[in-house]
Amino acid sequence: MKRTHPLWMLLVLTLALALGACSDQAPAAQAQENTIAPYELNQQERDLLSAFGLTEDNALALSFQAPAEAKALFIQVSRLEDGVWENVADSVSGFGMDGPQEDLPDSFAGLLCLEENVDRSLSVHVQSTFGGFANTPQGAAPDLEWTMRSTAFLQETQTIQLDQPIPIALLAYGTGTSMSSLDLQSYFTPEDLAGLDLVQAVTVTFSETL
């Protein structure tokens, strides 16, 4: 039975003080300017999420503070097909704000949450100073048979460069007896991921244009 409490809903509840309704003081408190980085949950928050089956193995929370020129954030869930990344949806999900720079919030900052669902689909939710966004779960593979699974989530602060995709998650599944650990940088060299039954990636891209 699929959970009825997706990660983003729980994080909004458990991090209510940190989010501060997306005020200028939060949720960017942990992210330095021009970076995206893991959001450090305290033990109480981890325990609460774990009670709903959300752990560091299947969920991710990141805080970000985009460059001053950024007006949009795009999120893409891709699947490796014949050595090439293919978007699993008809379009790239994203949101932002347009208009003169002086009319926008002082900073584009927020919290991004990712959850791997039981059918292998991926859900993303963003709360930010530009507003909120949630995608329809993408990349479902309910009939996939696998015996091995490996994941790589963003674990270190990453500098944001406009219009350059940043891989934040790689998830691989196979039916063999062993599987090598994943490296996020393999997103840029997909040939390193050959031989796996299913590989999915999540990237985020900050842009000056919607």
Where are these regions (language model features)?
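Extracytoplasmic electrostatic interaction patches
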Residues: S93-L210
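Compositionally biased, intrinsically disordered/low-complexity regions enriched for serine, proline
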Residues: R3, D24, L162-Q164
